[in-house]
């Protein structure tokens, strides 16, 4: 259902904007409260996107690509760029174009096109870069956990394309680089884990320093690395047996651990070594470091906690009070790893499975800036890890569509400035006239590096309107244009360039706000506010997210609501805004704002996924969907409210990170008595089966795979549902509830009380 809505709303372009018409002055834009922003899924799949087997024509002044909005003079064979109005001549190979013979990029319906670019000359004729995976495995785990991780790795290696290059690093107290090309026996290069090592030291120790390294050349020769390097990176078809044998022999870290102490785990050194190895072998080629980590780093750079078990891992309170002694130093270290990986064009994927925290909060900068995947689970044996890890390497419809080595560039009409981006990207520091002075997220640029991206990757770009008073935007042309140019390497190694050009209207909101109101996208606005709040919580000391959200909601309702002064009962909201207060109510209660129920690792995990998923997925994170199943009616959406609970109903809650199947009291009793096994109760068996099938469909289509919880009313796991419901019935008004329903033991305000307070504050003189 959500996916259908998403397809309809994003269309061929994969772009959703908070406002689909823009006020033509900076002052009027600031009164809109919700920022001018666009959420783009740069490589989202769509059946109608044409693939053109040539390179695009670019404007010689602003570098925008030729598009359907350009004015074309077919007689003079020239086109006028809609961004800078530069007149550009068509090259000779376009001489046959006419009104009836258009190239693909000029068809009005093709506002998004994809170009197939020739491979770089350095790679040799017609050859493409194979994908590269360096697996980094933590061995400081109990035997059972290590076996789960090794089993997952073996399965992954079997699923890789035959030409994919594979490397392997294991670590515990020390980091071990395995020379897979030395098949006669197991050959390992050992790095001490207790101190930081430079990139040059890593290369010298591996025998890749100086003359043995290909200085600065891009990509592998003939599709594979040179002879000095294929010691460590081999095609999957050649090293599968060696690697499987190595994994069979691999044991838990043998270094002794004192009683009452944690294992000595050198995560930082292991990731440094993996990054250095890839930087020497394959700079500028699509490659991923896939790290499987089972506990906190306690040794060397990136340490997050001491070895003494009596010292707890940092909490949100510790971070707020600046009482986490290792935190800032670890973040600084991972920031340096992030910069190195971004320069090389490589990705860090993190699979963290442990009951304790492992340092996701510190590693967030390296994972997010490189566009890496992140999965957090309790065990390597848990379905959340096992199924998610398998999905990364699968082909077919379930494939994530992992792509490499991308860049996103934005061209925009004059008078529009780019403030920055939130999401899995890193600024390329490309300055220009379209770059704003104020910065949000990854700013000071009009281009970003996307080392890793997939079919659901979504970035939020923030815009501002030029403050120059002499020239009002929209005076000469009532339309403005934004162009998103995304180049990337697909899983087959081809380089593609996707060009999306969107056109929107300028309006004078000071004269009439009706068009502005009709162009408001409530879902996108809620997601953008959530991402902005999350960024501010991380970067601004003492930031109160709840108060900030409340103030902005009050300002928005004051601006766009209809009411009489000091008369709360008169307040009404236009249907284009009517769902927004509900989104903010649920956002205030969500794990993104109420962080003290979670560890810093969990909060970092939730925020990374919030920042990278498409709008429909992010909306479910903020406001879960609830479906009800009963004998009386087919499955239908239900209010996210405790009043939806009934003894004779089954509820299916999709909260994105978890999916809950909740059986009412009567349903649970009948199931326990085995009625569904009796032929005369076929309808009951079908009722039990329907939410199970729907929940499995959600689990199959989502990445990371959500936690599936099956529970009964009044059972211990019912809390997974109750925590997400509007507490319209609490212990304070339980006597008003109908039989078979439920109450929530909380002092939180309900949506109704929240809305009443909002009305009072909005209408105040």
Swiss-Prot record:
An example Gene Ontology biological process: intracellular protein transport
Alphabetized SUPFAM superfamilies for the sequence: beta-sandwich domain of Sec23/24, C-terminal, gelsolin-like domain of Sec23/24, Helical domain of Sec23/24, vWA-like, Zn-finger domain of Sec23/24
CDD domains referenced in this protein's UniProt entry, alphabetically: Sec23-like, Sec23_C
Pfam family, one: Sec23_BS
Keywords annotated in UniProt: Cytoplasmic vesicle, Endoplasmic reticulum, ER-Golgi transport, Membrane, Metal-binding, Protein transport, Transport, Zinc
Localization per record: Cytoplasmic vesicle, COPII-coated vesicle membrane; Endoplasmic reticulum membrane; Membrane
Region Zinc finger-like: start-end pairs: 59-84
Top-level taxon of origin: Eukaryota
Record membrane topology: Peripheral membrane protein
Positions that bind Zn(2+): 59, 62, 81, 84
Family annotation (InterPro entries): ADF-H/Gelsolin-like_dom_sf, Gelsolin-like_dom, Gelsolin-like_dom_sf, Sec23, Sec23/24_helical_dom, Sec23/24_helical_dom_sf, Sec23/24_trunk_dom, Sec23_24_beta_S
GO molecular function, one term: zinc ion binding
Coiled-coil intervals: none
Gene Ontology CC entries for this record: COPII vesicle coat; endoplasmic reticulum membrane
Quaternary state and interactors: Component of the coat protein complex II (COPII), composed of at least five proteins: the Sec23/24 complex, the Sec13/31 complex and Sar1. Interacts with SEC24A.
Main function: Component of the coat protein complex II (COPII) which promotes the formation of transport vesicles from the endoplasmic reticulum (ER). The coat has two main functions, the physical deformation of the endoplasmic reticulum membrane into vesicles and the selection of cargo molecules.
Protein family per UniProt: Belongs to the SEC23/SEC24 family. SEC23 subfamily.
Protein name: Protein transport protein SEC23 E
């Amino acid at each position: 259902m959500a996916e259908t809505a998403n397809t309809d709303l994003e269309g061929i372009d994969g772009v959703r904007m908070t406002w689909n018409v823009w006020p033509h002055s900076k002052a009027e834009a600031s009164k809109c409260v919700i920022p001018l922003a666009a959420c783009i899924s740069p490589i989202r799949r769509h059946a109608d996107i044409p693939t053109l087997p040539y390179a695009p024509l670019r404007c010689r002044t602003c570098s925008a690509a030729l598009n359907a909005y350009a004015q074309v003079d077919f007689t003079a064979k020239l086109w006028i760029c809609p961004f800078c109005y530069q007149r550009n001549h068509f090259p000779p190979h376009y001489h046959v174009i006419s009104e009836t013979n258009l190239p693909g990029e000029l068809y009005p319906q093709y506002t998004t096109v994809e170009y197939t670019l020739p491979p770089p000359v350095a790679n040799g004729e017609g050859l493409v870069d194979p994908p590269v995976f360096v697996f980094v495995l933590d061995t400081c785990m109990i035997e059972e956990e290590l076996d789960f991780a090794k089993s997952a790795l073996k399965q992954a290696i079997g699923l890789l394309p035959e030409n994919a290059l594979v490397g392997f690093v294991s670590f515990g107290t020390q980091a071990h680089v395995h020379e897979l090309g030395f098949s006669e026996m197991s050959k390992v290069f050992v790095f001490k884990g207790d101190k930081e090592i430079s990139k040059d030291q890593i290369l010298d120790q591996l025998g890749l320093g100086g003359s043995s390294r290909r200085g600065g050349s891009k990509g592998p020769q003939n599709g594979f690395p040179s002879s000095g390097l294929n010691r460590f990176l081999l095609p999957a078809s050649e090293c599968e047996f060696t690697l499987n044998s190595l994994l069979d022999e691999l044991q838990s870290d043998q270094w002794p651990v004192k009683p009452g102490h944690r294992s000595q785990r050198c995560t930082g050194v292991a990731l440094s070594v993996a990054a250095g190895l890839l930087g020497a072998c394959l700079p500028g080629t699509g490659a991923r470091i896939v790290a499987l980590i089972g506990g906190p780093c306690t040794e060397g750079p990136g340490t997050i906690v001491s070895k003494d078990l009596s010292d707890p891992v940092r909490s949100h309170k510790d971070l707020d009070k600046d009482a986490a002694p290792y935190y800032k130093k670890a973040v600084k270290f991972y920031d340096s790893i992030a910069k190195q990986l971004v320069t090389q064009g490589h990705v860090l994927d993190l699979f963290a499975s442990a009951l304790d925290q492992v340092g996701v909060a510190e590693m967030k900068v390296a994972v997010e800036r490189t566009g890496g995947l992140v999965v957090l689970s309790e065990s390597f044996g848990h379905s959340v890890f096992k199924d998610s890890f398998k999905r990364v390497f699968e082909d077919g419809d379930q494939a994530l569509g992992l792509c490499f080595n991308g860049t996103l560039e934005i061209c925009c009409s004059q008078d529009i400035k780019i403030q920055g981006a939130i999401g899995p990207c890193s600024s390329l520091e490309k300055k220009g006239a379209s770059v704003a002075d104020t910065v949000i997220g990854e700013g000071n640029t009009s281009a970003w590096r996307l080392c890793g991206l997939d079919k659901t990757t979504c970035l939020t770009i923030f815009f501002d309107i030029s403050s120059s008073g002499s020239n009002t935007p929209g005076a000469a042309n009532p339309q403005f244009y934004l162009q998103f140019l995304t180049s990337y390497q697909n899983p087959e190694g081809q380089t593609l360039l996707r060009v999306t050009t969107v056109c929107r209207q300028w309006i004078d909101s000071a004269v009439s706000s009706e068009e502005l109101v009709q162009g408001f996208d409530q879902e996108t606005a809620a997601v953008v506010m959530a991402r902005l709040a999350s960024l501010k919580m991380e970067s601004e000391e003492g930031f109160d997210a709840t108060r900030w959200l409340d103030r902005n909601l009050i300002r928005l309702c004051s601006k766009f609501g209809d009411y009489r002064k000091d008369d709360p009962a008169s307040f009404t909201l236009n249907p284009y805004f009517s769902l927004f207060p509900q989104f903010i109510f649920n956002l205030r209660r969500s794990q993104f704002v109420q962080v003290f129920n979670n560890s810093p690792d969990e909060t970092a995990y939730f925020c990374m996924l919030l920042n990278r998923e498409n709008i429909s997925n992010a909306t479910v994170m903020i406001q879960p969907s609830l479906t009800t199943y009963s004998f009386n009616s087919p499955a239908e959406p239900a209010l996210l409210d405790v009043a939806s609970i009934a003894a004779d109903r089954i509820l299916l809650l999709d909260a994105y990170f978890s999916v809950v199947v909740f059986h009412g009291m009567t349903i649970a009793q009948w199931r326990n008595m085995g009625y569904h096994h009796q032929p005369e109760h076929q309808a009951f068996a079908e009722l039990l089966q329907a939410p199970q099938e729907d929940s499995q469909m959600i689990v199959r289509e989502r990445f990371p795979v959500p936690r599936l919880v099956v529970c009964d009313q009044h059972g211990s796991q019912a809390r997974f549902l109750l925590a997400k419901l509007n507490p319209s019935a609490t212990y304070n008004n339980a006597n008003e509830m109908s039989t078979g329903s439920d109450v929530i033991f909380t002092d939180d305000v309900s949506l109704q009380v929240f809305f009443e307070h909002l009305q009072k504050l909005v209408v105040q003189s």
